[in-house]
Amino acid sequence: MTNETIASQLAHRTIRAYKDQPLTEAEVTTLMDVARHTATSSFLQSCTILHITDPKVREAIGAASGQPYVGGTKGDLFIFVADLYRNSRIRAEQGVSSEALSSINLFLTALEDALLAAQNVVVAAESMGLGTVYLGSILADPRPVVKALELPELTFPVVGLLVGHADQDPGQKPRMPLSVVTAKNTYPRVESYTETLADYDREVTEYYDLRSGSRLESFTHLVATNIGVGGAHVSPIMEVLHEQGLCLR
């Protein structure tokens, strides 16, 4: 069973190279309107999206991320912010304490709002024939990002997103089989993931082998060696959350 929307989602690829062709004002407005109509936890609408058009701000974000293409001029850059500040102001203006907004529970609702909005924008952008790439790398060094965006207390940059006209045609990265990532009712127990994923490991190795790089590895090897070594894995995220007045209880 398929339709145009499903076909677009199943064809998702990460695009890191873009043409020097900014989105039109109408395209940006459409994508932001899609984000605005995304489902939101408890109708609190705890997300703000920043469209980065200032070259200096973008360069600062690019430097913090460690990804050269983030700080350039190609593709439009959006930052999805978990935003409890706006609701704290609304409460203050009505004489209500905002202490509850510093809880991890409320941060998780804002985090969900931001991520759902980002994914809705990706689906919409790809349906328009545009390319996208998520930028979790903005959290490799979150303090400069918070500073560059002039984020107030009770806000946090959750994820970045580049959207634009693709200047590359990469292959689609294989995913684990449905039998591994889905189950009915209760969590599945697997005796050996290494054995279960053997065919998938070969598929991933072949994918990297066919690319124009020297990287050769399987999925299970990636999991065994890559977690905890990249910038985003050792970033002081919890410290910055606390500095922003978030997740204090």
Show the residue positions of the predicted features.
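Acidic, surface-exposed loops and disordered segments
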Residues: 1-249
